[in-house]
Design a protein with these regions (language model features):
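Flexible, glycine- and charge-enriched loops at secondary-structure boundaries
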Residues: 49-56, 149-153
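N-terminal [4Fe-4S]-dependent radical SAM core
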Residues: 1-30, 35-52, 65-72
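Conserved AdoMet/S-adenosylmethionine-binding subsite of the radical SAM
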Residues: 64-68, 72-75, 80, 84-167
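Generic, well-ordered alpha-helical segments
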Residues: 25, 51, 55, 82-85, ...
Length: 167
C-alpha cells in the first residue's frame, strides 16, 4: 500500500448476501454511523474506529474473487454503518467495480447528505458509479425519526428529493 492510497474502515464482509440488493451479492459493511437506531442490525458499526483499514484496490481484489457466485443479477453492495461517511472510499471502490462491469449497490440511511455544492459534486460522482441506490428512510415524521434514531431527518428527506429530481 502506498502512502497516497485511499483507505476506508471496513467492519466486515458478507460474501454470499441475499437480502441487500438483487441476486447474490458480496456485501461490504463499513465502519461508522451517526444514527443510533433502536432496531439497528449492526450497532457494532456505529463507532468510526474499529474494523480493518483497507485500500479500495485491496478490498476490490478480495471481493472480486467471489464474482462467479454473483451471476448476471448479483454484484457488490456497500452498507454500514453509514457508507456516505466514507464517500471517497466508496467512490474509488465502485470505480474499480465498474471497470470490471460489476453491478454496484449502495445501502444508506442518507443521514450525512447535504446540499453543499462541494458535497454534491462528490455525491454525483458516486451516483455515476452506482447501479442501485437503497435509501433506508426510518420515518418521514421528524419527531418520530428523532425518537427512533437520535437524529433529525432533514438531510435524509433532502436526499430523497434530490434523487427524485436528478433520477
Amino acid at each position: 500500500m502506498t502512502d497516497t492510497a485511499l483507505t476506508g474502515q471496513v467492519h466486515s464482509l458478507e460474501t454470499f448476501g441475499l437480502v441487500d440488493g438483487p441476486g447474490v451479492r458480496c456485501v461490504v459493511f463499513l465502519q461508522g454511523c451517526k444514527m443510533r437506531c433502536r432496531y439497528c442490525h449492526n450497532p457494532e458499526t456505529w463507532s468510526q474506529q474499529g474494523g480493518e483499514t483497507w485500500t479500495a484496490e485491496d478490498l476490490f481484489r478480495k471481493v472480486y474473487r467471489y464474482r462467479n457466485y454473483w451471476g448476471k443479477d448479483g454484484g457488490l453492495t456497500v452498507s454500514g454503518g453509514e457508507p456516505l461517511l466514507q464517500m471517497e472510499f466508496v467512490t474509488e471502490f465502485f470505480n474499480l467495480a465498474k471497470k470490471k462491469q460489476v453491478n454496484t449497490a449502495l445501502d444508506t440511511s442518507g443521514n450525512s447528505f447535504c446540499l453543499d455544492p462541494s458535497y454534491l459534486e462528490r455525491f454525483d460522482r458516486l451516483m455515476d458509479l452506482t447501479d442501485l441506490f437503497l435509501l433506508d428512510i426510518k420515518a418521514v415524521d421528524a419527531s418520530l425519526h428523532k425518537q427512533l434514531t437520535g437524529q433529525d431527518n432533514a438531510g435524509i428527506l433532502a436526499l430523497a428529493h434530490y434523487l427524485a429530481d436528478h433520477g
